[in-house]
Curated annotation (Swiss-Prot):
Protein task: One of the primary rRNA binding proteins. Required for association of the 30S and 50S subunits to form the 70S ribosome, for tRNA binding and peptide bond formation. It has been suggested to have peptidyltransferase activity; this is somewhat controversial. Makes several contacts with the 16S rRNA in the 70S ribosome.
Cellular component GO terms held in the UniProt record: large ribosomal subunit
Basic and acidic residues compositional bias, start-end: 229-246
Protein name according to UniProt: Large ribosomal subunit protein uL2
Example GO BP: cytoplasmic translation
Organism: Paracidovorax citrulli (strain AAC00-1) (Acidovorax citrulli)
Stored SUPFAM superfamilies: Nucleic acid-binding proteins, Translation proteins SH3-like domain
Alphabetized UniProt keyword annotations: Ribonucleoprotein, Ribosomal protein, RNA-binding, rRNA-binding
Length: 274
């Protein structure tokens, strides 16, 4: 892949940096794996905003991606690599030997025509999915399960991966990109390699309208509001917050830890690095 800097033919094009998609399939998505996606625009059944800064955006179908990879010992051939508007990673359409087709998250360096397989006896090769107990220590992995059979939940976005550090009894230690080290059961599955489209982080949208196409609405600063709307609001002319930064409901927003999941706290060996 390559990065393209657009010519400054207009203010909206001046700062645009795109990632090429020349290697991606240019036809329609596989219809049997498409589902309608109804946009809620951040509203509940009463029409009240429950999630701010959402609404509008381009309509698109949801691609049903196989995160479980549970067709063991059946080889699958990669038919094409596709763009997915629902995620930063690319997806690959694979055809199993029994004729079934599924979408998977496309790993880096996975070529069209390659053969992948899942299961405990699968070879250590990019795109193959195995239980963590069968993966060599030090391997780069992605699409990692947190519970056996629940489907991949970790390292699914573009360019991400994790490293298998050690195995102790029925648990393994996995280091995330953030630096967090987490204990994961060795029966959980993971895929060899890292997620493709690693240059996604170099992309620059160039204008606010692109965010609107993505269904993201503007974020208004609290200091620009009236005091009835935000704790930072009010004042004559330009004024500062006058207090520690808080959200519209008065909760601290900077440097305040929000994690509150005691049930899985014991699975974290070391917290992420800032």
């Amino acid at each position: 892949m390559a990065v393209i800097k657009m010519k400054p033919t207009s203010p909206g094009q001046r700062a645009v940096v795109k990632v090429t998609r020349d290697h991606l399939y240019k036809g329609e998505a596989f219809a049997a794996l498409l589902e309608p996606q109804h946009q809620k625009s951040g509203r509940n059944n009463n029409g009240h905003i429950t999630t701010r800064h959402k609404g509008g955006g381009h309509k698109h179908h949801y691609r049903v991606v196989d995160f479980k990879r549970n067709k063991d010992a059946i080889p699958a051939k990669v038919e094409r690599i596709e763009y997915d508007p629902n995620r930063t990673a690319h997806i690959a359409l694979v055809c199993y030997a029994d004729g079934e087709r599924r979408y998977i998250i496309a790993p880096r360096n996975l070529e069209v025509g390659a053969t992948i397989v899942s299961g405990s006896e699968a070879p250590i090769r990019v795109g193959n999915t195995l239980p963590i107990r069968n993966i060599p220590v030090g391997s780069t992995i992605h699409c990692i399960e947190l519970k056996p059979g629940a489907g991949a939940q970790i390292a699914r976005s573009a360019g991400t991966s994790a490293t298998l550090l050690a195995r102790e009894g029925t648990y393994a230690q996995v280091r995330m990109r953030s630096g967090e080290v987490r204990r994961i059961h060795i029966e959980c599955r993971a895929t060899i390699g890292e997620v493709a489209n690693e240059e996604h982080s170099l992309r620059q949208l160039g204008k606010a309208g692109v965010k609107r196409w993505m269904g993201i609405r503007p974020t208004v600063r609290g200091v620009a509001m009236n005091p009835i709307d935000h704790p930072h609001g009010g004042g004559e002319g330009r004024t500062g917050e006058g207090r520690h930064a808080v959200d519209p409901w008065g909760n601290l927003t900077k440097g305040y830890r929000t994690r509150n999941n005691k049930r899985t706290q014991v699975m974290i060996v070391s917290r992420r690095k800032k």
